[in-house]
Swiss-Prot record:
Reactions performed catalytically: iminosuccinate + dihydroxyacetone phosphate = quinolinate + phosphate + 2 H2O + H(+)
Keyword Lyase: no
Keywords: 4Fe-4S, Cytoplasm, Iron, Iron-sulfur, Metal-binding, Pyridine nucleotide biosynthesis, Transferase
Protein name: Quinolinate synthase
Named cofactor requirement(s): [4Fe-4S] cluster
Entry similarity comment: Belongs to the quinolinate synthase family. Type 1 subfamily.
């Protein structure tokens, strides 16, 4: 079947980088945010890919730094009446779907995700309609509208286990939106998977030849790879996994030097986990080429201290996440299935 929208050829305009803050400005906004969090009965929920100073602030204020699955769990269970989600838009939507009674704020509602942008709901609905015999599994990196069409939502940390489970039931799968993660899961499980053709603009840029040269330069290094990366990069890995799984692998691998193929925002928590190990960025620019993302999501970078302070101070349409109630109820069903399934895996 042909699909009118082609994620492979889509070019997403990057947002402007936030204006760098001085040391004094950073100190001012840090103290202001801490005060506003207390006044608003709010807690910060930050993704591993946000900048280190944002993750540090979340730690210092009793918040959460995690992958998207744990962000969802933490936000739903925390008693705070307001969640400040430092991440990208779908993460704020997911928080609102799971916690409709809470106020969900984001530093900016313009923080997108190329996987989300690469899966427009109208085209995706048509794709699903053309394959009515397939169970629809969508990655967490999708809009509320796409989640509402799905049977299951999944994160990379439990993707293999879920598809293995569905395959054991004889179910055929539509997987969206990440083609690389879909192919990785298919290879691991042998499941019958029909993939949407989206990709993460960060992980899609990792280059095999450049990584090979870096490996030759550091032959004692282990390679850690997120499965949103191209198959050729995954094939070079000593460990493959979600952000939380890569941090765990960094601790268990005996190597003292690690080449990391995911967004460099992860280095903050990974270095905490292995303070005695050297972390190297996997290359995103090939021979004679330049990188666009350069191993850091440009939309994650929009979560700066000034924007967080403004979100807590101003609230309003520029910062508060809203999800249509009927859409929220439909999207909640596959999200709850994911959380229930994840709970069974934890025993």
């Amino acid at each position: 079947m042909s699909v009118m929208f082609d994620p492979d050829t889509a070019i997403y305009p990057f947002p402007p980088k936030p204006t760098p803050l001085s040391i004094d400005e950073k100190a001012y906004y840090r103290e202001k945010i801490k005060r506003l969090l207390k006044e608003r009965n709010a807690v910060m929920v930050a993704h591993y890919y946000t900048d280190p100073e944002i993750q540090q602030l979340a730690e210092e204020t009793g918040g959460c730094i995690s992958d998207s699955l744990e962000m969802a769990r933490f936000g739903a269970k925390h008693p705070a009446s307001t969640l400040l989600v430092a991440g990208v838009r779908f993460m704020g939507e997911t928080a609102k779907i799971l916690s409709p009674e809470k106020t969900i704020l984001m530093p900016t509602l313009q923080a997108e995700c190329s996987l989300d942008l690469g899966c427009p709901v109208e085209e995706f609905n048509a794709f699903c309609d053309a394959h009515p015999d397939r169970t629809v599994v969508v990655y967490a990196n999708t809009s509320a509208a796409v989640k509402a069409r799905a049977d299951w939502v999944v994160t990379s940390s439990i993707a293999v286990e879920l598809i293995d489970h569905l395959d054991s039931l004889g179910e055929k799968i539509i997987w969206a939106p990440d083609k690389h993660l879909g192919r990785y899961v298919q290879k691991q499980t042998g499941g019958d998977i029909l993939c949407w053709q989206g990709a993460c603009i960060v992980h899609d840029e990792f280059k095999t030849q450049a990584l090979t040269r870096l490996q030759e330069e550091y032959p004692d290094a282990a390679i850690l790879v997120h499965p949103e990366s191209p198959q050729a990069i995954v094939d070079m890995a000593d460990a493959v996994g979600s952000t939380s799984q890569l941090i765990a692998a960094a601790k268990t691998l005996p190597h003292q030097r690690l080449i990391v193929a995911t967004d460099r925002g992860i280095f903050y928590k990974m270095q905490q986990a292995v303070p005695d190990k050297e972390l190297l960025e996997a290359p995103t620019a090939g021979e004679g080429a330049t990188c666009r993302s350069c191993a850091h999501c440009p939309w994650m970078a929009m979560n700066d201290l000034q924007a967080i302070a403004e979100a807590l101070e101003q609230e309003g349409s520029n910062h508060e996440v809203h999800v249509d109630e009927r859409l929220r109820e439909r999207a909640l069903v596959p999200l709850n299935r994911m959380l229930d399934f994840a709970a069974t895996l934890r025993g």
